[in-house]
């Protein structure tokens, strides 16, 4: 079957139904159109070809008034959600055209309208959405250098807005929320941000909308109307002009695609990025907070360790808390105290977890109820969840801490809604809403009467069957039913001669005949009339119950949030007691003191093996920077990540893996750990490293924690050492930065900075030598390492013996003693005393003009070459000198 393009079809030649299909399709050109025909949603032309391929459906054809049949495929209406979700997850948008009237009662063409457009960011089907993760739609507006960012999860009702003023902060927000769909104005689309890269990294659909979505007046109006306020100041948007446009554009997009009142979007949360600890994309990735670097999975992350939640709502809230650590000491202490109180009341906590466990996803249930897509089983799940609330509320009353008391007060048992569901809905209803069997007996008088007529009708049929058997002598006479012929008598051919004259033939089969009578017709009208009326009435009654629940959306969402936070606190309490965590003291003096700290994830992954704990001490004075040396594989990276994770956990409000901990509030954590080429962006390992270092040096503050691992290793030894050295000098200077820093390096020459730069201290990983072999003790000790043990590590890794032996020979010849001696000289003389052109001390430099490297004059290099005593230089000296001169020239050319 050849592909027929809808744009090229002669409309006048088409059938009326197909003409309407194409008119509807024209209104939604970027969507696949699901067009309801009876019990199926059908697709035609190129949509059919696309869907049949994507969903592996049979492609057929339909007469459409043209010589060539229209390509067609379809899916059953009762199973549409699964097919919809599969298409949307592949990045398609789907418009659903529903029958708006009963085809039996329609005069002419059945009326059909698009009732909803389903997109990746507007999915509400809980069977498809990941329970523990939000499904976000994000709107971005770029106006006059300001990015307005609004994020919404229509499945839960979460709705947020903020503003950022640079591209890096914007990308951090995007990756933090990881939306499945992103809509934007044309200015953002053309701003130079690599949208193709964003699509790939997020696996998201990105669309630039028409300008009408971003009209200042219309965005403000739609927000005022939705939230029933006269001024946007009431929403906290007084100082968020661009943010308001983003929030309004998102709302208008939802109105147009969902064709729904969106009554479950009850509040707009306005936030600033400064309300929480800043974690850039690199830090989130390197610390593996919610997803591992390689496998992209939850197992092996901090979230995996902390997540002992019992509800989907709690799991999502915990993820949010991990990604947004607090910087408010008061709020941290409230969480800590709640966890401590739960720890001290073990039995009550276990009871709490027991009652939390059966609770369904209230946030997404009320979302579907508000959307009017919830089915009878959703209401039963909702009612069963409400049954747990009084018990949870009673347990929370036992606690005296501020946060737990607030949660108890916010938890509404919703007894009236529980009673409504118990009275109205049968305990095991069908999943569909239009086939009856939903409403309980005794709930509605007319429904009971129709149900009784339906039940009695079956008795009447049985009596009629028996009566006609006796009257006719047809022993196997039976009353049967099907949807085409209704009720009928079936008589086999062997008794055909006994059929009386008042039997009216309806159908002839191979082995039997089917008949009706006036009395059977009369009973059929009564019974089927009662059934049809009952099914219709039950649907109306179900909708009334659903509407009544939807009208209480504010109460339900408030309770859902209270349940989610209760679940999170219980989870953190379980983790604290199970893994022997301690309550950290939170200080505002900038001190980080950890006694016997442990890496929360590595400790759990090790199973029965003992984790070697380590101490950490950093402050804003004499202990700002720890230079950490030692061989690869010894545990430097684990130790540094451990310190960052303990700090982050403390600011979540969690207990931490240590014997003692005193954590100074950090405004940001930056990490530069590991190296990987960013091939998608065409950036090398070293370029990625330098970009991240530049970001850290430009955006860190004295209250930040920096985790820097092997800075400078992606280039030549001399360049790398120079960069690492300059970075330490820059960070150590309190007039410039003065941030608390863990700096791991294989450049032992950097240990010379201790005693010459304020706040720098040397630490190393203890190693025990046994002949040519080494044992990693995993212990951080004071002082610098005197060897890198690279050959021993290579031996442990299984490098062939001849290579190891040759390496031992070469290491004696290629000793870096000259480099070390020169480094010591530079350190003793201080920054800027080198024999080449003087480099100013960091505090003498205009920060706006400062660069890591200074440039050299070509005449200086020529003079240096002329003064060389070549005849007295060893081959190694000559090579070292040539390398230095080459590096200087490269640096000069880079700055031309």
Model-predicted segments: where are they?
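ATPase nucleotide-binding head domains, primarily ABC-like/P-loop NTPase cores
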Residues: 45-48, 240, 310, 321, ...
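C-terminal tails and terminal domains of large nucleic-acid-associated
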Residues: 851, 855-896
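Active-site phosphate-binding and catalytic loops of NTP-dependent enzymes
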Residues: 97, 120-129, 261, 397-403, ...
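Charged, surface-exposed helical/loop "interaction arms" that form contiguous linear patches used
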Residues: 371, 375, 385-388, 402, ...
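Single conserved hydrophobic/aromatic residue that forms the stacking wall/gate
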Residues: 1-7
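Extended, charged coiled-coil "arm/hinge" scaffolds of SMC/Rad50-like chromosome-maintenance ATPases
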Residues: 426, 509, 513-547
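Charged catalytic and DNA/RNA-contacting regions of genome-maintenance
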Residues: 8-341, 357, 361-370, 374-466, ...
């Amino acid at each position: 079957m050849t592909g027929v393009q809808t744009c090229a079809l002669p409309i006048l030649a088409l059938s009326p139904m197909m003409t309407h299909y194409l008119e509807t399709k024209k209104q939604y050109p970027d969507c696949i159109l699901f067009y309801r025909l009876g019990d199926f949603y059908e697709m035609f032309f190129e949509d059919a070809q696309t869907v049949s391929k994507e969903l592996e459906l049979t492609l057929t054809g339909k007469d459409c008034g043209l010589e060539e049949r229209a390509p067609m495929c379809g899916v059953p209406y009762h199973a549409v959600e699964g097919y919809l979700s599969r298409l949307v997850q592949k990045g398609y948008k789907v418009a659903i055209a529903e029958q708006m009237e009963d085809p039996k009662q329609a005069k002419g063409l059945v009326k059909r309208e698009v009732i909803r457009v389903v997109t990746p960011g507007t999915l509400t089907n809980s069977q498809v959405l990941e329970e523990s993760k939000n499904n976000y739609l994000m709107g971005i507006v770029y106006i006059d250098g300001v990015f307005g960012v609004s994020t919404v999860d229509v499945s839960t009702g979460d709705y947020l807005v903020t503003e950022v003023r640079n591209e890096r902060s914007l990308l951090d927000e995007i990756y933090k929320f990881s939306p499945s769909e992103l809509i934007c104005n044309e200015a953002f689309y053309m701003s130079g941000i690599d949208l193709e890269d964003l699509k790939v990294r997020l696996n998201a659909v990105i669309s630039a909308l028409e300008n009408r979505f971003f009209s200042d007046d219309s965005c403000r109006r739609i927000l005022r109307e939705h939230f029933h306020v006269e001024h946007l100041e009431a929403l906290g948007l007084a100082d968020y002009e661009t943010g308001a446009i983003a929030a309004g554009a998102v709302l208008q997009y939802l109105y147009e695609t969902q064709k729904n009142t969106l009554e479950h979007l009850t509040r707009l949360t306005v936030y600033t990025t400064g309300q929480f600890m800043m974690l850039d994309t690199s830090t989130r990735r390197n610390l593996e907070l919610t997803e591992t670097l390689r496998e992209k999975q939850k197992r092996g992350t901090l979230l995996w360790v902390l997540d002992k939640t019992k509800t989907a709502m709690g799991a999502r809230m915990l993820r949010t808390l991990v990604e947004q650590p607090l910087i408010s000491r008061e709020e941290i202490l409230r969480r800590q105290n709640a966890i401590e109180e739960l720890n001290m009341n073990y039995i009550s906590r276990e009871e709490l977890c027991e009652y939390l466990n059966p609770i369904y996803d209230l946030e997404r249930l009320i979302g579907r109820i508000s959307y009017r897509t919830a089915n009878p089983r959703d209401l039963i799940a909702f009612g069963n969840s409400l049954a747990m609330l009084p018990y949870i509320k009673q347990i929370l009353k036992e606690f005296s801490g501020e946060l737990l008391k607030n949660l108890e007060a916010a938890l509404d048992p919703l007894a009236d809604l529980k009673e409504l569901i118990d009275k109205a809905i049968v305990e095991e209803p069908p999943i569909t809403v239009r086939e009856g069997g939903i409403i309980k007996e005794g709930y509605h008088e007319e429904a009971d009467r129709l149900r009784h007529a339906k039940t009695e009708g079956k008795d009447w049929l049985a009596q009629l069957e028996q009566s006609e058997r006796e009257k006719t002598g047809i022993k196997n006479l039976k009353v049967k039913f099907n949807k085409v012929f209704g009720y009928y008598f079936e008589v086999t051919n062997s008794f055909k001669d006994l059929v009386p004259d008042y039997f009216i033939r309806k159908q002839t089969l191979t082995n039997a005949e089917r008949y009706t009578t006036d009395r059977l017709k009369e009973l059929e009208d009564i019974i089927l009339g009662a059934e049809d009326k009952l099914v219709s009435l039950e649907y109306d009654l179900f909708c009334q119950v659903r509407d009544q629940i939807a009208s209480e959306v504010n109460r339900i969402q408030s309770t859902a949030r209270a349940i989610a936070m209760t679940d999170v606190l219980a989870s953190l309490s379980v983790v604290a007691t199970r893994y022997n965590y301690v309550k950290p003291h939170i200080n505002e003096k900038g001190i980080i003191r950890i006694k016997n700290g442990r890496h929360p994830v590595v400790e759990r992954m090790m199973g029965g093996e003992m984790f070697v704990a380590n101490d950490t001490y950093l402050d804003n004075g004499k202990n700002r920077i720890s230079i950490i040396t030692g061989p690869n594989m010894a545990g430097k990276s684990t130790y540094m990540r451990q310190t960052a994770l303990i700090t982050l956990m403390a600011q979540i409000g969690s207990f931490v893996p240590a014997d003692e901990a005193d954590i100074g509030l950090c405004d940001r954590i930056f990490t530069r750990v590991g190296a990987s080429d960013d091939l998608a962006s065409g950036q090398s390992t070293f370029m990625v490293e330098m970009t991240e270092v530049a970001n850290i040096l430009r955006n860190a503050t004295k209250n930040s924690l920096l985790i820097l691992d092997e800075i400078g290793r992606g280039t030549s030894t001399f360049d790398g050492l120079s960069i690492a050295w300059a970075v330490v000098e820059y960070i150590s200077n309190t007039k410039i930065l003065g941030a608390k820093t863990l700096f791991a390096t294989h450049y032992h020459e950097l240990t010379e900075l201790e005693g010459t730069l304020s706040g720098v201290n040397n630490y190393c990983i203890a190693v025990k030598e046994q002949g040519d072999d080494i044992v990693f003790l995993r212990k951080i000790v004071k002082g610098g390492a005197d060897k890198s043990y690279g050959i021993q590590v290579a031996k442990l890794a299984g490098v062939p013996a001849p290579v190891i032996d040759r390496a031992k020979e070469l290491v004696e010849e290629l000793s870096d003693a000259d480099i070390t001696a020169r480094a010591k000289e530079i350190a003793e003389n201080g920054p800027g005393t080198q024999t080449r052109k003087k480099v100013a001390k960091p505090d003498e430099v205009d920060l706006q003009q400062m660069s890591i490297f200074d440039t050299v004059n070509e005449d200086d290099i020529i003079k240096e070459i002329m003064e060389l005593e070549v005849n007295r230089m060893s081959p190694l000296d000559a090579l070292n000198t040539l390398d230095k001169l080459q590096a200087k020239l490269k640096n000069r050319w880079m700055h031309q």
